Swiss-Prot record:
Residues 224-236 have a biased composition (Polar residues). Residues 293-374 form the SAND domain. This is Nuclear body protein SP140-like protein. It comes from the Eukaryota. The keyword ATP-binding does not apply. A zinc finger (PHD-type) spans 403-449. One of its GO terms (molecular function) is DNA-binding transcription factor activity, RNA polymerase II-specific. The gene is SP140L.
Amino acid sequence: MAGGGSDLSTRGLNGGVSQVANEMNHLPAHSQSLQRLFTEDQDVDEGLVYDTVFKHFKRHKLEISNAIKKTFPFLEGLRDRELITNKMFEDSEDSCRNLVPVQRVVYNVLSELEKTFNLSVLEALFSEVNMQEYPDLIHIYKSFKNAIQDKLSFQESDRKEREERPDIKLSLKQGEVPESPEARKESDQACGKMDTVDIANNSTLGKPKRKRRKKKGHGWSRMGTRTQKNNQQNDNSKADGQLVSSEKKANMNLKDLSKIRGRKRGKPGTHFTQSDRAPQKRVRSRASRKHKDETVDFQAPLLPVTCGGVKGILHKEKLEQGTLAKCIQTEDGKWFTPMEFEIKGGYARSKNWRLSVRCGGWPLRRLMEEGSLPNPPRIYYRNKKRILKSQNNSSVDPCMRNLDECEVCRDGGELFCCDTCSRVFHEDCHIPPVESEKTPWNCIFCRMKESPGSQQCCQESEVLERQMCPEEQLKCEFLLLKVYCCSESSFFAKIPYYYYIREACQGLKEPMWLDKIKKRLNEHGYPQVEGFVQDMRLIFQNHRASYKYKDFGQMGLRLEAEFEKDFKEVFAIQETNGNS
């Protein structure tokens, strides 16, 4: 967070500010359009510039973030130009005050800018103020300019090559006679071959090799010389003879193309080109169909399925119940869900059973798209008939609330619905993890309601000394889940950044975070309630001790206050003046 002068001095640049100023003299003025930001040519294709700089920006976000040592004036400039919102600006500043490294904050901002990238992003990034404040941006700016120039040079080289090549149709135009069907057919074949040679000269597997392209270009020039000589020899002939000779020359030139290429299609060493790829794809497609089983009746209620070397029978009716229904029966009589069948087949890493599991050689997703197979809902409702009564006595399906939102993380995905209330959870977001095999399954909110409502008030010291029996375990799990439901919990879920900073972590006790407590709790690693409460409070103690600014840390204070309030309510702790 040092000032601009100290940043320049620490860089160890020869000449210091004067060298930076000298570099700045060669940079474009901020008022110039981005089309001329990296090139002096006004006629450059702006689409080409955009595509090139976007890819370069995407690949060099890490270098850019490393060049920016402090947030001012980088973040302020983005906010003033309305490239980031005030909320993003404030969140970024808060993260820095919370000792999150500046480079990490800048990288996150660049990642957001990438999603809505436009050319004004680079105008702001390479503004005169930023270039003076962050000298390391100068060489990054030059890398953008070099990327543009290389792209333009490559395009210009290709354009000149095309101009130097003879026009295959020239001999036909000189004769001013319409093509016969045979000549047109041969001409089309020649054009296809010419395009193949052209593309092969320009790239090999998409990587340009200019030396090779130049060598090929010489071959085309020799052919052009021969064509011109042939044309000169026929200039003195009569009109009728010229018409005949022009057609013959066209056929001759078309046949010569295969000789110039030097290789026949299909032999080893042939370049992969756009002309070659199309028929190859069709051949592969036809070949792949040979492995499909055309005898399978996809409309049948039972379908044979495979995954790797495992075979089974898929029951459509069971699949309609949801992705967690055991709808596939293997040869040994065991039942599996689609995901379990995928794992048994050796495709656990795929995590996409719709593609891993096949029927008649086709992935199940293809059958679902064609309507031959039902697409099961992402949420598995064990009891679809359950209906709650609202205040106006109208029937309300409880699963209509938050169908696509986990109660804890507020995100979508594969969700599990409680059989008593309308809440849905990810399997691992719920504490303890959802028991998918248990029917009916009740979430922890419903289980807490079922527990005895009236409790005798007691001192906190008495609560902390309790053994972790099932009832106390349930209460601790509920407390932790309530913390995860708070938006502030995301910062404390993983190990905080300040544990990696030597100056910040000095004097701190054992590193502690929510996921670590969650793992211990799920493994029944706390013999007493005291151990759980101590770990929770340790998170907030370490957070307070790591503050750089006393007026900051509202995020941790709010979460701590919420936990203490819930702790007293759940365990019916009696308030005392000396209670912390």
